[in-house]
């Protein structure tokens, strides 16, 4: 499998040249679309799926059977930087700490232009590919045979250490439809070798609001609190760093062959935003606040989920419910007005996923 992927990738790359992309800023002009600029890099990290080292939900069942060392993996994640020098990380505010492994939040309104200055700090080729937005071939960020010119393919596979600039636009069809909430979720991710890229950790959220519907800080006017949660099964056997991670985990797979289902099971992490067993940072809100939840699933075979909130209900697709359904890479939003004070469980209702630790807590204050 690895050999066939390598041959395919080398064939597609053979005709490409990868100079550093450049961008000339548009002058200030009220008649022009608003340009939202982001500086994002793909960085290597050591990621801990359970940094506290234990199950914080208190639900009955065994703690992670392999111990905390089995939840530490080398991964790649998207980080936001303050400028194009890519030397100073932009701090993540407390309200967005729950994003966990997800890349920085990209926001825009219908009619805007999004400019992403991207740098690849990893050891493998990668990219940034957005769902839902409009883009030319130069900014698709997805490597496949599409008869585009070599010049138009440069952003599909950014080499280690190199930079590239993506330009995405937000037409009406990228924003909320009639009957939608005022803001909707899209996802961006690396699309070089998509299964490997995403299982390595390269994915993040995009929120698009209807034109004129946001506050000065970019949040929707009709919402007081937002949460973004990825119901993500990470298959570490599909990571670019599987070999190096496996070297540190041999004792957990002794006597198992790679082809054994039990071997792969040891490398499946059932996470919410890359964190398991209640290790997701606190999600808090006040009674009566207007809360919007944005949910999506990762792209593995196991990523069929039924997110469920205890103690509250939400409005999803104009229906009152306390549980929604997700398929691989499906994105949804649900609105909540919490009325039940306390700390509540939020989890996937698929039994294997509950047992794997796909659970978190949220708290409603008076």
Positions of PLM-derived features:
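Bacterial N-terminal signal peptides that target proteins for export
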Residues: 1-9
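Bacterial N-terminal signal peptides
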Residues: 8-19
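Copper-binding active sites and cupredoxin-like electron-transfer domains
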Residues: 21-366
